[in-house]
Amino acid sequence: MAWADICAFEDLVENSGICALLNGQQVAVFLLAPSDEPQVYAVGNYDPLGNANVLSRGILGSIGEQIVVASPLYKQHFSLTTGQCLEQPDVVIPVYRVKLQQGRVWLNAGQQNQQASAA
Amino acid sequence: MQQTKQILVIGNGMVGHHFVEQLRAKDPLVQITVLCGEAQLAYDRVHLSGYFSGTSAEQLALTTEEAYKASGIQYRLNCWVEQINREQQLVVTSHGGQFYYDELVFATGSYAFVPPIPGNDQPHCLVYRTLQDLDAIAQSAALSKVGVVIGGGLLGLEAANALKQLGLQTHVVEFAPQLMAVQLDQAGGQMLSQKITELGVQVHTGKATQAIVAGAECRYQLKFADGECLEADLVLFSAGIRPYDQLARSCGLAVGERGGIVVNDQCQTSDPHIYAIGECALWQQKIFGLVAPGYQMARVVVSQLTAGGLSFSGADMSTKLKLLGVEVGSIGDAHARTPGALSYVFTDPRAQVYKKMVVSKDGKRLLGAVLVGDTSNYDSLLQYALNDMLLPKQPEQLILPATSGAPLAALTLPNSATICSCHNVAKSDIVAAMDGGSCDLAGIKSCTKASTGCGGCTALLKSVVDDELKSRGVEVKNHLCEHFAYSRQELLHLVQVGGIKTFAELLSRHGQGLGCDICKPTVGSILASSWNDYVLKKPHVGLQDTNDTFLANMQKDGSYSVVPRIAGGEITAEKLLVIGQVALDFNLYTKITGGQRIDLFGARLEQLPAIWQRLVDAGFETGHAYGKSLRTVKSCVGSTWCRYGVQDSVGQAIAIENRYKGLRAPHKIKMAVSGCTRECAEAQSKDIGIIATENGWNLYVCGNGGMRPRHADLFATDLDTDTLIRYIDRILMLYIRTADRLQRTSVWMEKLDGGLDYLRKVIIDDELGLAAELENQMAALVNTYACEWKATLDDPQALKRFRQFVNSPDADENIVFVEERAQIRPATAEEKRQWQQQIPVTEIAVKALAEEN
């Protein structure tokens, strides 16, 4: 799968999310910056429980060891590493591979978690 | 499967209709035929008097002929049954029609009893039972000035209300020495008489009407047994009901001595193929004249005809209602007839409130209650009675006015109490989830779905869970979440004492993990009310809920609504035009809010800055509709225009709104100012309510509407403006400093040890010596206020966030609108599938954006 150049690193918002368009798919990209080592995560922007493209506007955090985003609509938590909804484990959103290179943010259109449904 | 059965229903009142509806829902195939004696299908008889205050017959209707047809329900109107042949299972109507049945259901209801008084059959002597009766009453009323209702029971008072609404001078005549003798005790009946008399209805109790003869001044004269008389043009009988059981008698079914078709626990009559439900049925020598037991019987019969299982076991006849505007409630043994029963009575002659509680001999159980003038205790009393709950040690607290602050005691809620109405989760479901091993909020939410709908029950749910944990001996920590082992109040102290300015600093010094959607917005609010930094400053951005981040209210489809501040609800014509033009240009849906301002819906994320640029240029500021902060200060028009106003309520509201706008708090804050005691601004339903007096202002505190409405308490009277503002400063600042997350002022005050009195001591008497400090803190916040939208528009970095995609100018294709009542609304999922191709709103919006730039 090909990598796509999405935006400059500066376009990310610290401890929050932005949304990118990748081959017609909406992808939420989060920058977690608790330490010197910035961590970037990418998941589908569509909240399958609220049925709207809003996850990039959710609040980041951790529940136990899981790094999560809370949907701004009904507050369910989705894991940023597995895409699984903590409240309804049968609901899984796509997780995308993401890398930082030369000050740019790259996304890979191939989903990382195969179990996520395309819908 | 058996062959499809023929079910025949006689009568289409509320109960008959409920039966048909329930049966069809359970069995889509069964043949249902309804024979309805009236000219229209079922309508709401409970709210019949609304017919005279503007409710149309269509609005009262419970169904339509189309709906019956669509569900395959056969029906005949104006159809009276002549005869029933039980052997052949055949019903013959007066038109000669014949209907075969497998099972027959009597839902014939009842008719108004007309006492055998000579002269009761004259043209303007009427009854109050059906829509046709109502038409006759209206016709007669047009030719009458004075009306009298014979019968002072529940229905009689309803009828009196109808006559009053028709503009007649209204009398009520009751044979018993008091009104509503079935439901109320004597003192309660007296209080009700007094209140109703003040509302302009003359009450005559202990009067036996002996004859209705021609009158001297009016059409008729009622002659009473005691020699007195009363003149009236219209006589309305409402002296009770009698079951329609003639048909059952004539076909040989068992009926009671005083009427009513005898049924067993399955609502079966003496013929196993014939059932009777509602007011025509007699169960254990009792007739149930309320709609709820009738519905229960309907469901019992539906269960008999389908899966089986349900049986009728009597019904609670407790009632709560508003008669002629007076609240009345009656529960269980209202007359204290249980041997050994004890009564507690509270009377407030000034407010005209009467409350009585009947308790068992040992004082442990509630047997009954009477409430007149204030039924706010009805629900909790009813729960005590129905669930046979153990009363508190001092049961009188339950009916005494809540001066000491009756706590929201979740533990005392019965298990059947509904906590989350969106997902219909009862307290018992939550307890079961905890029995099943869930012992934290998140777990309980995920397995019961409670609080995952509108979220309005979040605080109540937490309270239930905490209390339940406490009762199980689990130590409940008031910790905000897993990241901070502190309450909100403790965190606020840590922030202020430590001079902590960012979430990261607080987390590293006092917390663990990364934070979450609970602690981040809470800390954001604490930081804002401590230092009043711009909420979108870089370190604070990630703390805010989306509404605070984008300074707008997210709607279900991910679009936003925009609410400019309209302080006190006062707005110039020019500004109205601006709002209208903005709405037109961006194709927004407009709606007037309850807080006297205008909400603009359907703005997409990337449109918000352009919309606000226009609004800010025209002099608008953000309305903070998105924040846990001051929302609005509602006002009535006040002494400037109103004949009754005694102070300038609008001016006061505007000054107060401008003083506290932007103030971040544990929850939203609403206020109102009324210009006189008529209270048109509804200030007593607000966190801070102000009502003008001849001498100044009365201050009410800690009220709210919403899910658990609470009247505000009178805090101080006849204040001058300066004192008024100082008290509000102190109260709000104390609330911000000590309340829990998402705790409204009402719950906060109720949970304060000592309640309202304690609050008075701190605020008015300054017993803690805090007053000056609280005022200074408020002054600092007021002085550093800045409109967040103006600040955002001036900040290119902040503006960058207002785009759907970081790498594309496209709009979110999932936001699609359709037109309804000449405005947009979000398309349903089905509509989106159908019209995926046309997205007209996007084009309009893009055009508007292009013009802006």
Tell me the role of every PLM-derived stretch:
Chain A
Residues M1-Q66, S79-L80, V92-A119:
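N-terminal pre-ligand scaffold of iron-sulfur
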Residues D47, S71-Y74:
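Short cysteine clusters
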